[in-house]
Swiss-Prot record:
The keyword Hydrolase applies. Removes the formyl group from the N-terminal Met of newly synthesized proteins. Requires at least a dipeptide for an efficient rate of reaction. N-terminal L-methionine is a prerequisite for activity but the enzyme has broad specificity at other positions. Its EC number is 3.5.1.88. CDD domains: Pep_deformylase (cd00487). The lineage of its organism: Bacteria, Bacillati, Chloroflexota, Dehalococcoidia, Dehalococcoidales. It catalyses: N-terminal N-formyl-L-methionyl-[peptide] + H2O = N-terminal L-methionyl-[peptide] + formate. GO terms for molecular function: metal ion binding; peptide deformylase activity. This is Peptide deformylase.
Length: 167
């Protein structure tokens, strides 16, 4: 396992539509392990493959209650319900956080790290993570949802970003 460099805006890989993972082989397993280690090292809540420079449809995130890593390969959001205002940050946009609207409940489908089909229904922070990380795969960042510059805030030197928004 290795800690990979996290890409930051304006790196082009963050704005590209990622390609489907064609097969789950040893290189994908290594990428998954590296992404989990990188996410944990950066104290992030989630990470998408483009954030480590790999344009593939693969995301990892930590369950807030268990801190266990969840892996979704070729994820697709199939249902969104409700809305809630959230504060959100991104490891690829360091030093800032924004206020935006996300779904209260999100259902996504994809494959787990072993290639088994899975479906995840998340509420609250898990729904937010599913939306945020899956959008990375289409080149969409949370800042694209901000309605005005007033919704983007710089993190001061003494500010600590809440764990649930370090995505």
């Amino acid at each position: 396992m290795a800690i990979r460099r996290i890409c930051e805006l304006p790196e082009p890989v963050l704005r590209k539509k990622a390609k489907k993972v064609p097969s789950i082989d040893g290189s994908i397993q290594t990428l998954i392990d590296d992404m989990i280690e990188t996410m944990n090292s950066a104290d992030g809540a989630g990470l998408a493959a483009p954030q480590v420079g790999v344009s593939l449809r693969l995301v990892v995130f930590r369950e807030p209650d268990t801190k266990e890593a969840t892996v979704l390969i070729n994820p697709e959001i199939v249902k969104k319900e409700g809305q809630r205002q959230v504060t959100e940050g991104c490891l690829s946009i360091p030093g800032y956080f924004g206020e935006l609207t996300r779904a209260e409940t999100v259902t996504a489908k994809g494959l787990d790290r072993h290639g088994k089909a899975c479906r995840i229904k998340g509420t609250g922070i898990v729904a937010q993570l599913l939306e945020h990380e899956t959008e990375h795969l289409d080149g969409i960042l949370y800042i694209d949802h901000l309605e005005s510059e007033d919704q983007l805030h710089e993190i001061g030197p003494d500010d600590e970003m809440p764990e649930e928004i370090r995505e």
